[in-house]
Amino acid sequence: MSLLTEVETYVLSIIPSGPLKAEIAQRLEDVFAGKNTDLEALMEWLKTRPILSPLTKGILGFVFTLTVPSERGLQRRRFVQNALNGNGDPNNMDRAVKLYRKLKREITFHGAKEIALSYSAGALASCMGLIYNRMGAVTTEVVLGLVCATCEQIADSQHRSHRQMVTTTNPLIRHENRMVLASTTAKAMEQMAGSSEQAAEAMEVASQARQMVQAMRVIGTHPSSSAGLKNDLLENLQAYQKRMGVQMQRFK
């Protein structure tokens, strides 16, 4: 796996699934391939994205600044600086300074990542803030190692939270989660179906599923009534893809 592929993997792991994630993935690919060289426009686009947390925007802005060629004197962006200040916690800043000194002596991506993983996400974000404001004091490989370590810390906590929700025994939460998944699956089906004549059937199935979820929420239904709803939709999607000559077996 190449270094930039690894960085892209870690960065995308902290972004919530949805159309915006697909859009960000495309921007990252373009940046890493050297196709997008307008840093100013890229940062303005990032700043106005909905849904993303300030920290996620800060990390993405940091990665873009690091990888898009730009003039040395380019103004640092306030939304990135604010996100990477460790919540203003002096403890985070103290640890960040210690980590920064260690990273200045490191030269490899994996070495930097190993060192960084022993610090909290707050300290790591603060360290990124230090580097963002004094770009150039640490090698690019080392900085990318720091980025990946930060994303791993964040993804770990997100995974724990997600696992708690998935394994909850509360039937109401499980019911709502199944309906949300069914609704987002239906939306994805509509987007994938496109405008061809053969797509009408898939669009109809997706539309009916969304109407069903809406009705279930309006009238209130038994928590078990949503069981299997998402899988039924995925089976319909796979059947549609098979007729279109596309074989995708990895959705479930």
Curated annotation (Swiss-Prot):
Keywords: Host nucleus, Membrane, RNA-binding, Viral matrix protein, Virion. It is a peripheral membrane protein. Residues 165-252 are annotated as: RNP-binding. GO terms for biological process: viral budding from plasma membrane. InterPro entries: Flu_matrix_M1, Flu_matrix_M1_C, Flu_matrix_M1_N, Flu_matrix_M1_N_sub1, Flu_matrix_M1_N_sub2, INFV_M1. A motif (Nuclear localization signal) lies at residues 101-105. Residues 1-164 are annotated as: Membrane-binding. Pfam families: Flu_M1, Flu_M1_C. It is found in: Virion membrane; Host nucleus. SUPFAM superfamilies: Influenza virus matrix protein M1. GO terms for molecular function: RNA binding; structural constituent of virion. SMART domains: Flu_M1_C. GO terms for cellular component: host cell nucleus; membrane; virion membrane. Homodimer and homomultimer. Interacts with NEP. Binds ribonucleocapsid by both interacting with genomic RNA and NP protein. May interact with HA and NA. Cannot bind NP without genomic RNA. Plays critical roles in virus replication, from virus entry and uncoating to assembly and budding of the virus particle. M1 binding to ribonucleocapsids (RNPs) in nucleus seems to inhibit viral transcription. Interaction of viral NEP with M1-RNP is thought to promote nuclear export of the complex, which is targeted to the virion assembly site at the apical plasma membrane in polarized epithelial cells. Interactions with NA and HA may bring M1, a non-raft-associated protein, into lipid rafts. Forms a continuous shell on the inner side of the lipid bilayer in virion, where it binds the RNP. Determines the virion's shape: spherical or filamentous. Clinical isolates of influenza are characterized by the presence of significant proportion of filamentous virions, whereas after multiple passage on eggs or cell culture, virions have only spherical morphology. Filamentous virions are thought to be important to infect neighboring cells, and spherical virions more suited to spread through aerosol between hosts organisms. Most abundant protein in virion. When expressed alone can form virus-like particles in transfected cells. Belongs to the influenza viruses Matrix protein M1 family. This is Matrix protein 1. It comes from Influenza A virus (strain A/Ann Arbor/6/1960 H2N2). The gene is M.
